[in-house]
């Protein structure tokens, strides 16, 4: 799961806040895709409103009696973010990371180890607001809510100029399902408040609204509708992530949903973007046996290995002569069968 999450971090639409170039198999400004863009813009506008309300509540935080109001505003802002998440992560991944990245300092590889940047966004607010003494963290909370507001404004500007294709809309949905499975359900972005199940449901509501322009009354869609209802019912049956049956949810609900959505996309003859990335464009789910492409991690000018190079790599993987004392190989720890 961790490996999938790491690979997914490299899979957001463009990698930077820019408009993806539609591939040869897609057409930009597809009518249904542009209807979806309108939905996404409305979601981001709602996010801006909720973040402004959160900021106002945080500024008014003075006593313990004010904490529930701030927490309520935080929950609403987070729900608005989750509704917008698939679009923000796909088209403005840099901004999305600033809004919802982990509450950990970050080192810039290009700047060197001395360039350490503090975390920002929702997760920083969450740690302060859901800690032991949120009132004493008022300055930190208001600093972050004040940071969120221009980030959302930036996202509004970028989404206002956005174009889309059917292929990119469906790709964004597929990535969101993978994000729910690998980052949402495990509690990666709700580590303290523990709201991951409710937020996963909000993210799925974003998926439902995103695909509404494509919906049709036929058997392929009825399968998707049924699975979506089952998925959301299971998420809403409990708020306790620790007792939630993650395996059953993934194997019996979310993976079949991804597969059913793939069938709907194919039935509508919607292609996939032409970009190369670790999570294969034509994979139905992140759990497919061939979901990941090693070339997605390679330099842009790299070429696939030849059979001879692959065979050499396999021999070196098991060769103990490469270790200092000649007793260990890569396969000593990394057992391919496991």
Residue ranges and their predicted role:
Residues 20-296:
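Mature extracytoplasmic or organellar-lumen-exposed domains after removal of signal/transit peptides
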Residues 296-317:
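Short, charged low-complexity linear segments at domain edges
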Residues 287, 291-302, 324-328, 338:
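Electron-transfer interface patches adjacent to heme c in soluble/periplasmic c-type cytochromes
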Residues 1-9:
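Bacterial N-terminal signal peptides
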Residues 231, 337-338:
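Solvent-exposed helix-loop boundary motif
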């Amino acid at each position: 799961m961790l490996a999938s999450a790491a690979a997914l971090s490299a899979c957001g639409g463009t990698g930077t806040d820019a408009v993806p170039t539609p591939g040869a198999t897609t057409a930009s400004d597809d009518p249904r895709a542009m209807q979806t863009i309108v939905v996404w813009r409305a979601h981001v506008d709602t996010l801006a409103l909720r973040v402004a309300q959160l900021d106002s509540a945080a500024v008014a935080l003075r006593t313990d009696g004010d904490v529930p109001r701030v927490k309520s505003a935080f929950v609403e802002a987070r729900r608005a973010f989750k509704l917008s998440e698939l679009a923000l992560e796909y088209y403005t991944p840099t901004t999305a990371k600033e809004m919802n990245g982990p509450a950990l300092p970050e080192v810039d590889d290009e700047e060197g180890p001395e360039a350490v940047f503090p975390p920002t966004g929702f997760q920083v607010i969450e740690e302060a607001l859901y800690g032991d003494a949120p009132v004493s963290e008022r300055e930190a909370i208001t600093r972050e809510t004040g940071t969120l507001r221009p980030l959302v404004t930036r996202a509004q500007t970028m989404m206002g100029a956005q174009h889309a294709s059917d292929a990119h809309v469906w790709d964004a949905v597929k990535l969101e399902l993978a994000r729910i499975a690998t980052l949402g359900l495990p509690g990666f972005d709700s580590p303290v408040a523990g709201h991951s199940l409710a937020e996963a449901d909000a993210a799925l509501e974003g998926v439902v609204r995103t695909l509404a322009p494509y919906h049709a009354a036929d058997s392929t869609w009825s399968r998707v509708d049924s699975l979506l209802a089952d998925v959301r019912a299971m998420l809403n049956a409990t708020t306790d992530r620790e007792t939630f049956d993650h395996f059953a949810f993934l194997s019996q609900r979310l993976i079949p949903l991804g597969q059913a959505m793939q069938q709907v996309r194919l039935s509508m003859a919607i292609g996939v973007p032409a970009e190369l990335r670790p999570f294969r464009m034509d994979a139905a789910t992140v759990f497919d046996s061939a979901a990941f492409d090693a070339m997605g991690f390679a330099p842009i000018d790299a070429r696939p290995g030849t059979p001879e190079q692959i065979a050499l790599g396999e021999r070196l993987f098991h060769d103990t002569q490469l270790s200092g004392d000649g007793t260990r190989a890569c396969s000593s720890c990394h057992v391919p069968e496991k």
